[in-house]
Amino acid sequence: MAKNRFNQSWLHDHINDPYVKMAQREGYRARAAYKLKEIDEQDKLIRPGQVIVDLGAAPGSWSQYARNKLAQGKRRDAVREGGIDGTIIALDMLPMEPVADVHFIQGDFREESVLHQLEEVLAGRAVDLVISDMAPNLSGVAVADAARIEHVCDLALEFAQNHLKPDGALLVKCFHGSGYSQIVEKFKHQFKTVAPRKPKASRDKSSETFILGRHLKQPR
């Protein structure tokens, strides 16, 4: 009975969520697009001509937002792919419906075959921005969940270290909990500038937050 009440409450909140309604109206696949939008408007992350990698991209709302932003910024004389000035590569182990002008690679980005596909698209270019809305399956057991969250952030940090330009940026989703301070310290070890972000589009009840790192300390 309690579970049914919880499901009904969640459904009520979801249906009446202004960001859900806005996403439906503006054609975004998930309300998460507005989290990236708020952070981008604050920090000016996405700019014409960039190479952007979206980790854990499905269902694709972050790639959609990035694509729309690069389409708005296209220059008449730009060398661009399709309707955007720049390159967006989305990776996920899950399938994802195509997004216009976005290269999608399905698979685990730790595997050689997936990295080979990525390198083919990059064609020797370094990445300007890595965005990650990845989240592990949470068990409700605090210690186990903290380890899973930290592992996902570690994967994004390692990917960024291997692919970012020296002045590049990494934005990852994280959760406040027992391991949060350790994750922040890892960011500070890797980036010159580190800042937490809690966009208004994140639900009030959620411990979700985002960490933004800029300018690698030891670029490869």
UniProtKB/Swiss-Prot annotation:
Residues bound to S-adenosyl-L-methionine: G60, W62, D92, D108, D133
General function of this protein: Specifically methylates the uridine in position 2552 of 23S rRNA at the 2'-O position of the ribose in the fully assembled 50S ribosomal subunit.
GO-annotated cellular components: cytoplasm
Main location, first listed in the record: cytoplasm
EC number(s) on file: 2.1.1.166
Residues of the active site: K173 (proton acceptor)
Family stated for the protein in its record: Belongs to the class I-like SAM-binding methyltransferase superfamily. RNA methyltransferase RlmE family.
Example GO molecular function: rRNA (uridine-2'-O-)-methyltransferase activity
Gene3D superfamilies: Vaccinia Virus protein VP39
Region feature Disordered, mapped onto this chain: 195-220
Lineage: Bacteria, Pseudomonadati, Pseudomonadota, Betaproteobacteria, Burkholderiales
Record flagged with keyword DNA-binding: no
PANTHER family named in the record: RIBOSOMAL RNA METHYLTRANSFERASE, RRNA METHYLTRANSFERASE 2, MITOCHONDRIAL
Catalytic activity: uridine(2552) in 23S rRNA + S-adenosyl-L-methionine = 2'-O-methyluridine(2552) in 23S rRNA + S-adenosyl-L-homocysteine + H(+)
Subcellular location(s) per record: Cytoplasm
Designated name of the protein: Ribosomal RNA large subunit methyltransferase E
Pfam families named in the record: FtsJ
Top-level lineage group: Bacteria
